[in-house]
Amino acid sequence: MPAARQQRGAAVEAAARAQLEQAGLRLVAGNANYRGGELDLVMRDGPMLVFVEVRYRRDARFGGGAASVDFRKRRKLVLAAQLFLAAHPALAALPCRFDVVEASGEPPLLHWIRDAFRLDDC
């Protein structure tokens, strides 16, 4: 991945994290890499464990970032979440949800989609 694209991704993830923290969520982990995929942000929203996918699109004409979280990507996120929970058994009993923060434009505008998909969507 080109350096400029990596920097943009890191900046958008940091902005997403800041927005979620301002809304009261607390960071548990960031950029957690597993065999099946990566979890951009893992956060707590009260008793809820939240797996957050952050997606940036420079231009939203062809669907925003959330549109790129297709069936295949959702399956990878679920697998990564399962591996995360296996590695952190103290968190495994918490209720979980999957959120998406999509960003588009320059400067990026963020849109937080709570409960963007459920396990039965995978």
Swiss-Prot record:
InterPro entries: Restrct_endonuc-II-like, tRNA_endonuc-like_dom_sf, UPF0102_YraN-like. It holds the Pfam family UPF0102. One of its GO terms (molecular function) is nucleic acid binding. It comes from the Bacteria. Coiled coil: none annotated. HAMAP family: UPF0102. Belongs to the UPF0102 family. This is UPF0102 protein XCC0710. It comes from Xanthomonas campestris pv. campestris (strain ATCC 33913 / DSM 3586 / NCPPB 528 / LMG 568 / P 25). The lineage of its organism: Bacteria, Pseudomonadati, Pseudomonadota, Gammaproteobacteria, Lysobacterales.
